[in-house]
C-alpha cells in the first residue's frame, strides 16, 4: 500500500487524427486520477455522457469533470494465502495507511514476487540481523494506523501517526477512510471462503447482514485495548463467522502485545472451529498465551488438506517473530518433511510455504527456496515471452 506500488504515471497519447478531442495542449497534470476514471473518459471522448451509476470522472472530452478529486483511496486484501486487509487514502500531500491485522507482517511471502533475486537478498540480510531499521520494517508488526508526509518523506519511512502536531490530519484521514468503507459497502473484511457458492454482494443485501456492526468491530480490533475485552468476548461467540474471526484478531493483538496472559476457554475452543481461517487465527492467538504446542500443532495439522496453507500462513507470521522461533523449533522435522514431500513447483504450492518457514528459522538457505524444478520452469516461461505488440505509432 506504499506509493512505490500505487503511484503509477498515466501517459495519454492522442494520435494526430484524434488530437482535437484532447482540447488541451501537451503537458503534465498532477491531480489524483485512478483506474475508475478511464471508462468515463473513453465515453466522454466519444461524446457519450457517462451514466450516473458509473464510478470515476472523465478527464478529457465533452463531459470532462472539472472538479478535482480531493481524496484517493486504495485497498488490498490478500497476499496469496495471507488474508490481511489493508486500506489507504491520500490527499496528495499526506498518506494514511490502515492495517486491520497489524501483527501480520508485510513481508509474508508470495512466491512469484520472491522469485526475484532482490527479494531473496533482502530476506537474507534482515533474517541474519543486517541492514538498518528502515529496511527491516516490512518484517515486523506495524501500527494499525500510519501517516506519512509525502512531500517530506516520499519513501514513507517516518510514521507521523503518534506525533501530536499531526493529530488533526490523522483524524481527518481516518474519518475519510471510515466513511469510504461504508459508502462503498466494502466487502473485503469477509473471509475469503465466504464467497464460495453465492455472490456476496447480493447475499449481504438479501439477508440484511449487520455490516455496521462488522465495520465497527473491524475498526476497533486493530487498536484494541483491554477495555475492549467484553466486546471481544461477545464477538467470538457470534453465529457469524466474520464476527468470530475479527474477535479473535482482537485477542491475538492483545496477546502478542502481552496485554493479556490468560487464555479464555472460548478462544481455545475456536482452534476447532469449522471455519479454517478462524481456527488458524485462534491457534496463532493462543500461541502467545502460553499454549505454544497446542497452537502450533493446530497450524501444522489442518482438518482438511486443502486448508493447510491457511495454517501455514499464520505459522509463517509466527516464524518472523524472533521470540516465537524457539517454540516452533521442535516441529522442524515435520516442516522439513513437508518441504520435501508437498508440491513446491507452482506459485501457490504448500511446499513453498513450508520452505519459507524453514528459511525464517535459519534451517534452510533462501537460495534453496525454489529448487531446481521450479527454477527451470521459470527459465522456460520467461525465455518464451515476446515483446508487447502493437507499439504506439
Label for each model-derived stretch:
Residues 1-69, 158:
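Substrate-binding rim/cap in mid-to-C-terminal beta-strand-loop elements of soluble/periplasmic
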Residues 4, 35-39, 52, 56, ...:
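A structural signal for well-ordered alpha-helical scaffolds and beta->alpha junctions
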Amino acid at each position: 500500500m506504499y506509493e512505490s506500488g500505487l503511484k503509477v504515471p498515466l501517459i495519454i497519447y492522442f494520435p494526430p487524427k484524434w488530437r482535437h478531442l484532447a482540447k488541451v495542449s501537451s503537458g503534465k497534470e498532477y491531480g489524483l486520477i485512478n483506474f475508475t476514471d478511464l471508462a468515463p473518459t473513453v465515453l466522454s471522448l466519444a461524446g457519450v455522457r457517462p451514466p450516473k451509476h458509473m464510478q470515476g470522472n472523465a478527464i478529457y472530452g465533452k463531459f470532462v469533470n472539472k472538479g478535482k478529486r480531493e481524496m484517493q483511496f486504495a485497498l488490498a486484501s490478500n497476499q496469496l494465502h495471507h488474508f490481511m486487509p489493508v486500506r489507504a487514502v491520500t490527499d496528495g500531500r499526506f498518506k494514511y495507511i490502515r492495517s486491520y491485522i497489524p501483527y501480520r507482517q508485510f513481508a509474508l511471502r508470495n512466491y512469484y514476487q520472491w522469485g526475484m533475486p532482490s527479494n531473496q537478498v533482502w530476506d537474507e540480510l534482515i533474517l541474519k540481523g543486517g541492514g538498518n531499521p528502515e529496511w527491516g520494517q516490512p518484517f515486523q508488526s506495524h501500527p494499525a494506523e500510519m501517516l506519512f508526509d509525502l512531500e517530506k518523506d516520499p519513501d514513507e519511512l517516518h510514521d507521523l501517526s503518534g506525533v501530536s502536531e499531526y493529530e488533526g490530519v490523522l483524524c481527518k484521514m481516518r474519518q475519510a477512510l471510515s466513511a469510504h468503507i461504508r459508502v462503498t459497502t466494502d466487502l473485503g473484511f469477509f473471509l475469503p471462503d465466504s464467497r464460495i457458492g453465492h455472490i456476496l454482494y447480493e447475499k449481504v443485501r438479501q439477508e440484511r447482514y449487520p455490516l455496521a456492526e462488522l465495520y465497527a468491530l473491524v475498526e476497533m480490533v486493530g487498536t484494541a485495548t483491554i477495555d475492549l475485552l467484553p466486546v471481544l468476548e461477545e464477538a467470538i461467540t457470534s453465529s457469524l463467522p466474520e464476527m468470530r474471526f475479527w474477535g479473535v484478531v482482537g485477542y491475538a493483538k492483545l496477546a502478542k502485545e502481552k496485554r493479556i496472559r490468560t487464555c479464555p476457554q472460548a478462544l481455545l475452543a475456536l482452534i476447532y472451529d469449522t471455519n479454517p481461517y478462524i481456527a488458524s487465527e485462534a491457534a496463532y492467538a493462543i500461541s502467545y498465551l502460553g499454549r505454544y504446542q497446542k497452537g502450533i500443532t493446530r497450524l501444522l495439522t489442518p482438518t482438511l488438506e486443502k486448508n493447510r496453507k491457511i495454517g501455514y500462513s499464520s505459522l509463517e507470521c509466527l516464524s518472523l517473530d524472533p521470540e516465537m522461533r524457539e517454540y516452533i523449533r521442535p516441529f522442524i522435522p515435520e516442516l522439513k518433511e513437508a518441504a520435501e514431500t508437498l508440491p513446491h513447483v507452482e506459485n501457490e504450492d504448500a511446499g513453498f510455504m513450508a520452505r519459507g518457514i524453514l528459511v525464517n528459522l535459519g534451517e534452510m538457505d533462501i537460495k534453496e527456496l525454489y529448487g531446481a524444478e521450479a527454477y527451470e520452469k521459470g527459465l522456460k516461461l520467461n525465455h518464451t515471452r515476446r515483446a508487447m505488440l502493437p507499439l504506439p505509432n
